C-alpha cells in the first residue's frame, strides 16, 4: 500500500511539473523570437511575465538585466541610463538570490558596472574599475573555461591598456583564447547564455590589424 501511495505521489508531482516546464519553455522561446526580430520591448515584457510566473528560474531576470545593459551602451541621457541600469541591477540582484556564485551572473554584473564607466570614465572609472576586474577574476575562478568571462575580462583589460598606452599583446592572446573556448562551449540548455563569439572574433581581428 505504501509503495502504491509513493507511486501516486510521484506521478502527481511529475504531472504538475511537466506543464509548468512546458509553459516556461514556450514563454522563453517566444521572448527570444521577439528579441531576434528586433522587438526588444516585447521581449523584455515577456521575460518579466515569465520571471513572475517562475520565481525559481534565474534566466528571465538575467535577460531583463542584459537587455537593459545592452540598451545602455550608447545612451547619452543620464536619466534614461540610470533608469535602465537601475532596472538591470534590480533584476540581476533577483537572479543572484536564485542562483548564487553563478559565473554568468557575475559577468553580467561586471557588464552593468562597465556601462557606467563607458558613460562617464572620469566619474565611474575610479569607482568601479577595480571591482570590475575582481568580478571577472571571480567568474573565471568559478568556471575557468567560461568563454564570456574570458572574453569580457580580456576586452576590459585591453581597452584599459589602450587608454593608458600599454602593450595590448597579452590581452589579444586572451581574446584569441576566448574564440577557441566559444568553439567548444556547450550551453546547459537552449535558453542559457551563449552570446559573445561575434564580439570575440571582431576584437581578435582588430588585434591583427
Model-derived segments and spans:
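Terminal, low-structured helical/coil segments at or just beyond the last alpha-helical repeat
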Residues: 169-173, 177-209
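Start-of-domain marker
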Residues: 21-69, 76
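Helix-turn-helix repeat elements of alpha-solenoid scaffolds
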Residues: 34-46, 81-91, 125-133, 172-179
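Short coil/turn linking the two alpha-helices of tandem helical-hairpin repeats
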Residues: 70-79, 110, 115-124, 159-165, ...
Amino acid at each position: 500500500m505504501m509503495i502504491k501511495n509513493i507511486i501516486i505521489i510521484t506521478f502527481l508531482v511529475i504531472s504538475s511539473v511537466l506543464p509548468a516546464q512546458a509553459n516556461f519553455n514556450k514563454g522563453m522561446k517566444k521572448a527570444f523570437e521577439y528579441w531576434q526580430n528586433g522587438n526588444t520591448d516585447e521581449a523584455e515584457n515577456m521575460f518579466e511575465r515569465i520571471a513572475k510566473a517562475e520565481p525559481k528560474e534565474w534566466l528571465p531576470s538575467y535577460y531583463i538585466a542584459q537587455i537593459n545593459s545592452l540598451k545602455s551602451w550608447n545612451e547619452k541621457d543620464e536619466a534614461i541610463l540610470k533608469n535602465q541600469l537601475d532596472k538591470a541591477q534590480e533584476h540581476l540582484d533577483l537572479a543572484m538570490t536564485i542562483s548564487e556564485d553563478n559565473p554568468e551572473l557575475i559577468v553580467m554584473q561586471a557588464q552593468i558596472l562597465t556601462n557606467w564607466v563607458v558613460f562617464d570614465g572620469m566619474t565611474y572609472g575610479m569607482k568601479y574599475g577595480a571591482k570590475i576586474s575582481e568580478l571577472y577574476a571571480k567568474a573565471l575562478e568559478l568556471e575557468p573555461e567560461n568563454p564570456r568571462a574570458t572574453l569580457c575580462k580580456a576586452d576590459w583589460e585591453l581597452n584599459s591598456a589602450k587608454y593608458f598606452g600599454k602593450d595590448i599583446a597579452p590581452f589579444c592572446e586572451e581574446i584569441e583564447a576566448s574564440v577557441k573556448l566559444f568553439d567548444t562551449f556547450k550551453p546547459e540548455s537552449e535558453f542559457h547564455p551563449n552570446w559573445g563569439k561575434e564580439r570575440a572574433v571582431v576584437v581578435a581581428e582588430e588585434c591583427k590589424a
